[in-house]
Structures are given as C-alpha cells and as structure tokens.
Amino acid sequence: MNMEIRLAQPDEYETIAAIWYESATQMDGGAPALDDPSTLSDRIIRSVEKGWCLNVAVADGHIVGLLATIPEDSILDQLFVAPEAQCQGIGAALLDKAKQQLATGFTLRTPVTNVAGHRFYERHGLRVIQDTAHPITGAPVRRFGWRQQATEG
C-alpha cells in the first residue's frame, strides 16, 4: 500500500466528514453527541478557521484517515481511520505525525467506552491522565497524554 500524510484541502472536507462519521459511530460505544454527517463539513470549516491543523492519510489515491491537531493548545483533537482501512498501520502513522507536529507533547480525550482506542494509544506510548466529563457534552471521557522521552526521536 502506497500511503502519504498531507494537509487536507477544502474540497476534501466532505470526504473527511464521511470518514469521521463512519469511524466514530463504529468505535466501541459509539460517539456521543457527534454532529449529523451533513453538518460535519461545516464543523470542519469552523474548526480549521479556529486553528485546527488538518491532515489526511491518502492510500492508493483515496483518503483513508484524518488527523486534527490544535498546535496552539497542544491537543490532538481528532484521529480517525476509515473502518475498511484499519489495522494497516494508518492510525500509527497519523499518531506519529501528531508527535511530529506537537513535539513537546499533547493531550487527547476519547470516550471511556472506546476500549480499542485506549489500547491503541497505550501501545503507542500515551499514558492515561484521568477519566472526566467532556467539557461540552458531559459524556464520560478518558484523557491521555504524550510527552517525548529522552530516548525518542
């Protein structure tokens, strides 16, 4: 599989929204309070305007994953891989890209029910910070953090 990670283009936001929605709704426990797929493109536009750095993973000419970071706040905000492209190293490559973009460290949150996601993040060196409530929806989330270790990079 030939894959690259690059900045997303505005004409790709609909495709990105579809992958985001499909992946989020299929993760363990689903995605509480996720926007309707028809409005996710608008949410992407607003988020990019507010400071998202939005990257896509492209394999064999097709977008198969997304990574949204907020560099100013050291946050990995969204990381999703299309269900049919999972377990092929794409998520790990996107997470490595986040580690490059946010080299001093970052935090993220994921639903408490997303057990597969928890295992993925822990396998890739992230540590649990705390279980808490999502600041907007109130849904239970687990916060993870990553800091570059002296032996990395």
Which residues make up each language-model segment?
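Active-site acidic-Proline motif in GNAT/NAT acetyltransferases
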Residues: A82-E84, Q88, V112-T113
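Conserved acetyl-CoA-binding loop-helix of GNAT-fold acetyltransferases
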Residues: C87-Q100, R119, R123
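Acetyl-CoA-dependent GNAT
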Residues: L7-E84, L95-K97, Q101, H134
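Short glycine/proline-centered loop/turn elements that form peptide/ligand docking sites
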Residues: G91, L95, N114-G117, H134-P140
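Short hydrophobic/aromatic beta-strand or adjacent loop that forms the aromatic wall/cage
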Residues: W52, A139-G145
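Conserved GNAT acetyl-CoA-binding A-motif
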Residues: Q101-T113
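Conserved acetyl-CoA-binding loop of GNAT-fold acetyltransferases
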Residues: E122-Q130
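Conserved N-terminal entry element of GNAT/NAT acetyltransferase domains
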Residues: M1-D11, W146, A150-G153
